[in-house]
Amino acid sequence: MFGRIGLPEILLILAIALIIFGPKKLPELGKALGSSLREFKSATKELREEVNEVEEEVKENKSSDVKENEDNKTEKST
């Protein structure tokens, strides 16, 4: 129920925006909203990529640490 915007809700929002801002300002607001959404998507994509890179580095470091610990245990037992 919450989080989903259907066609009736979008039409209501557009009607309210048309009443508040008028027909001349509406295209400008649409362009501004579109560019803002594009920038937001780009920023979230970059952030997601950085998080994935850090996760990979952590996995690599963790696996190399485990291998070093195993090597140290083997050296101590011999």
Swiss-Prot record:
PANTHER family found in the cross-reference section: SEC-INDEPENDENT PROTEIN TRANSLOCASE PROTEIN TATA
GO MF annotations in UniProt: protein transmembrane transporter activity
Family: Belongs to the TatA/E family.
Topology with respect to the bilayer: Single-pass membrane protein
Biological process according to GO: protein transport by the Tat complex
InterPro entries, per database record: TatA/B/E (IPR003369), TatA/E (IPR006312)
Basic and acidic residues compositional bias, start-end: 59-78
Protein name: Sec-independent protein translocase protein TatA
